[in-house]
Amino acid sequence: VNAFGYLAALGDLTGSGKGADPELAGAYLRLKGTDKELNSLFRKEGISAGPTPSGFFVYNYGAAGIHRRGDWMVTLKAFNTDVWGSEIYTKDNRYGRYQSYGSAPIIGSGNPVSAAASGFVQEGWDWNRVPGATTIHLPYPELESPLPGTLMERNPERFSGASSLEGRNGILALHFVEKDRKNFTPGATAYKSVFCFDNRMVFLGSGIDNDNQAYPTETTLFQLRMDSPAEQIEVDGELYDAFPLNLSRGGERLALSDTKGNFYVVKNAAAVNITKKEQTSPNDKTRAPQTGNFATAWIDHGRAPKQAGYEYAVYIQPTNKEITRLIKKDGYEVL
């Protein structure tokens, strides 16, 4: 954070006539920088905290898009022939294979907002279930990188990336194919897209196809660490606070909430599994087991799916009025 402040203190780049750059200094103050000298300088220059960024931001050198409104942010991540899907090292991120398989974590809870307050905590995190991603749910010894050192796996398909509409809304599109590597499923493929409009995101998947008969293929809606086992999930209008919880639902239309105020509508799914439970997973550096309580929901495509797909919408922190309307009717149309 302080880097914003140091750059701002070098001088004004905007032509404002101030002794420090107001945009960089405003970003530093918004992010609550802690350098006392910088804070004093910016106050003397009459600079206050800048506005929170809002819009859809494209980062195709990372095959990524960031969708922001208010105090929440969603990072959409893919990979392609030029952008690797994750950075795995000897003692870092050993189970991070799925980070770019169409992931879409929502960061928007806490005061201040943080990843931890938004439910993203490593202790007990199931590395197979990255929100938004379509993955094969593997045992951890098989999910761990097959190489003892660095692995930066690329996607053999070039068509993956993000685009924006007038900087306000946008899309992520991804076609991925798994490489032929130890403990991978060669040729496993999926076509995925995410359309972002204000606080709505529409997730579409098709051509989900692989020959892995041993383990199920899944698309994760959410995985969130719970501060209390009594945190509630709403499923088709019914509240569930029991712990542990294990539900399976399907049908033409399924409406559910997560534990952070976000709302999901899943269309024509054979099976959506919803759990609240204690989970144990290995640390990404040491492999030591760690435990935590998590609420999770995922679409189960079964083993060795052939041309499977999905359609679901996510409404980020909707009002009660919005929820009432969405339960009855979609706010979008798939052409």
Language model segments and positions:
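Extended polysaccharide-engagement surfaces of secreted carbohydrate-active enzymes
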Residues: 2-335
